[in-house]
């Protein structure tokens, strides 16, 4: 079946008139008129060629009509995939085999399979029925409709014409232009002719970029990389210092004169013990200063050479707070000898208390 296009039809033309005009050259299967053009389906290809030759520019109702083969593409696929082809088979031999079922537009052999483009869909169906699972040059070939989306339309399949760029001398798979229209990279071919291309510098573990951030590449994974212990400690100290400045900047500064000398020093011993000063006795103050200046590690820690200890009573010992201040105020009126003896007892109690450590 051949579909013919009829253009420039006059308004007076009818379907019956067009059908009777084309039936002079062959059997008409279908005739349709759409406004000022129409389509006629003729069963025989030879009859269609005769109708085109005789009716093109035929004057109908005073108007010259145009008759030519329809150029619309058939919705049915005409591309066939032929598998299991003999390695000695050529394009001409395979084309001649399929031309037994209809005109072949293109025939390409790729290794042990090939693609054949038939002119008509009905010829492609007949070729599948007649050639599938048949012997050809010692091999049973398989013929089926192609499911490939690449080059669904025939043309530009030989080495003489690339279907991507349109130039001659190379296959489409060797075309320097990719599917997006950009020129492909020929790094391997360049290396073979002019030497290897220098590869970009690759950083090692723990190294930084050899360019500044303003001119170098951005490291999007910098926050996830493992940093050294020194870098983490320095960052933590800096953040803690900044946090202290921000949160305590509104507090008034403490004068150094209001802080005791033994607390204002930067080398304060956290384990050092000091007695509360007694304002009623100068000897007690001197003894307390001497005891404070003495080192803890310079004491005689042998229990055999110690003097006899006098355990304090329940009410004696160290005290802090308001009660201890009241006891110190009342002790100001006591005898200095009693205060000295009490100090010696408290000093021994302090020594016995911390000697276990």
From Swiss-Prot:
Residues 196-357 are annotated as: Interaction with TNPO3. GO terms for biological process: circadian regulation of gene expression; circadian rhythm; entrainment of circadian clock by photoperiod; mRNA processing; positive regulation of gene expression; regulation of translation; RNA splicing. Required for the translational activation of PER1 mRNA in response to circadian clock. Binds directly to the 3'-UTR of the PER1 mRNA. CDD domains: RRM1_RBM4, RRM2_RBM4. It comes from the Eukaryota. A zinc finger (CCHC-type) spans 160-177. This is RNA-binding protein 4B. The keyword RNA-binding applies. Residues 2-72, 78-148 form the RRM domain. GO terms for cellular component: nuclear speck; nucleolus; protein-containing complex. The keyword Nucleus applies. Keywords: Activator, Metal-binding, mRNA processing, mRNA splicing, Nucleus, Repeat, RNA-binding, Zinc, Zinc-finger. Interacts with TNPO3, which may mediate nuclear import of the protein. One of its GO terms (molecular function) is zinc ion binding. Pfam families: RRM_1, zf-CCHC. It is found in: Nucleus, Nucleolus.
